[in-house]
Amino acid sequence: MENLYALILGIIEGLTEFLPISSTGHMILGTTILGIDIDEFWKSFLIIIQLGSILAVIFVFWRKLFQGLDIWLKLAVGFFPTGVIGLFVAKYLNALFNGWVVVGMLIFGGVVFILIELAHKNKQYRINSLEEISFKQAFCIGIFQSLAMIPGTSRSGASIIGGLLLGFNRKVAAEFSFLLAIPTMIIATAYSIYKEPELLSNANSLIPLGIGFITAFIVAVLVIKFFLKFISKFDFIPFGIYRIILGFVFFYLYYSGILNAGSEFKL
């Protein structure tokens, strides 16, 4: 059963990590539906399978990553505000670990996506390639990304919204968001392990860890490629609508008492 749970959670991680729909929210649903008690092993599992998603980004974008130093400098600049803000506010984030915050941010983010797309319907995008992104714009995207520290926001959603507001076309906004995930998720994972080194010692079931990691990697590769093709033809409004629907699903689950807005949120 443990291996089946690992497979399902790996699929959820790969499906939701890079779509602007909140991977945290879907992990809450997934672990609750499966009846998983989030003990020390599963905490380790959820951290380690994120590395599979990171590897997927490197796999898909390796040519762009190794074209030169410029993209790495922009990613460093983009990560800087996220890292600094994270250091200062990390100890205060526990106050936000509440299901009602997830509900609010899911719905709010969905509305923002819809409004931005409607406002940009007839506008020309100014930034149409990664090379055109300035260091100032990369820094601003990092500020937007830091909003993802609020549960339910979605890291990719926050950074994509930032890109759209700065005049990036949809594909460039998504690509830079995916690439910015590399330093962000690696350092966030390393920080989690630094804070709780016992997480690695708890990762003693190699088979489910391997299943989750490989599944997250494969699914994330497919999702990234699909998503980039999708947004080259369509806008983000479907994702906005989905977020709003999911937000109301969570509202019902918390309001009815099916989910506990406090304890079950802390994965």
From Swiss-Prot:
**What reaction(s) does this enzyme catalyze?**
di-trans,octa-cis-undecaprenyl diphosphate + H2O = di-trans,octa-cis-undecaprenyl phosphate + phosphate + H(+)
- What PANTHER family does this protein's entry cite? UNDECAPRENYL-DIPHOSPHATASE
Keyword Flavoprotein assigned: no
Query: Which EC number(s) does UniProt give?
Result: 3.6.1.27
> Which organism was this protein described from?
Campylobacter jejuni subsp. jejuni serotype O:23/36 (strain 81-176)
Give membrane topology per the record. Answer: Multi-pass membrane protein
Q: Where does it reside?
A: Cell inner membrane
Q: Which domain of life is it from?
A: Bacteria
GO annotation terms (biological process):
cell wall organization; peptidoglycan biosynthetic process; regulation of cell shape; response to antibiotic
Protein name per Swiss-Prot or TrEMBL: Undecaprenyl-diphosphatase
Alphabetized UniProt keyword annotations: Antibiotic resistance, Cell inner membrane, Cell membrane, Cell shape, Cell wall biogenesis/degradation, Hydrolase, Membrane, Peptidoglycan synthesis, Transmembrane, Transmembrane helix
Family to which this protein belongs:
Belongs to the UppP family.
Main location (coarse class): membrane
Instruction: Share any extra remarks.
Output: Bacitracin is thought to be involved in the inhibition of peptidoglycan synthesis by sequestering undecaprenyl diphosphate, thereby reducing the pool of lipid carrier available.
